[in-house]
Amino acid sequence: VDQLETTLAGVLLDVAPVVLDAPDQPLQAAQTLARIAGETKLAAGSGLGLDPIGMAARGEESHADIAQLAQIANTLGARLFVVDGTAVHDQGASDAQELGYVLAAGVHYLRRYADHGVDPTQAAQGLEFRLSATAEQFPTIAKFRALRRLWGRVLELSGVPQEQRTLLLHGVTSRPMMAKYDPWVNMLRTTVAAFAAGVGGADSVTVLPYDQPLGLPDPLSRRNARNTSALLIEESHVAKVSDPAGGSYAVEKLTNDLAEAGWAEFTRIEAEGDILEALPSLLARVAEVAQRRDAEVARRRRPLTGVSEFPNLHE
């Protein structure tokens, strides 16, 4: 927070979207951003990054003053909440579990808005969604496409007009897919993941540095991470076509299957009352999935390049 003013020096806040990530000091960060912005309305897609449910999923507590933060968000023209699927993905959740969690968390925030008299149409504009993107290209494409379909259904049931059933979707390359051994392979993983997120309909993508599992990323890895999205947009033209995977039987089938599985997980969570009440049982199911995946890796039934396949014997 102390370095926020230095970080944003020279940034055109009405042009470049800014999203805060300050879970320990959300109010101080928001107040600092408001002071920097002054009378300027933030660019579309900006947000305060508040995610109390995600913090609960990670075993942390949120003491944010939501009422005061909501007032700042309204003044800045920024989104208040982020619905972050990486909170469960990083613990080993399957794609369906991540979708179910994101839907349930999103509905929880809609209810919080409704408790304060905000209608669903306006409330939906206060949310940003995040999904993890892995090197499993087609499942990642299908997951991003499925979320748009499922959230559209939630908004339909909430009475939101069709033309306003929009979704701001941000992709983050997966942390669990990264390997400490032969970390250069992580560049291939993150490139495929970023490509899949873009093809799946992400509005923006964060590419993690390839050496992040080793500690503080070096300048080369940070530069490569920043440039990956630019190369995919400017040279591969990923952003030129809307839904380029649409119509492909394989992708449509995967999307339908994931949408059904994600909705089933969502209804299972809702049957327990609310995402906060269902979180312990959801995390228990996530742990089971993670345990099975670890066993598959240990038995080489799930190969990892540079680790269990083609390892660098001199590393």
Describe each region flagged by the PLM.
Residues R223-E315:
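Catalytic-core signal marking the mid-to-C-terminal active-site face
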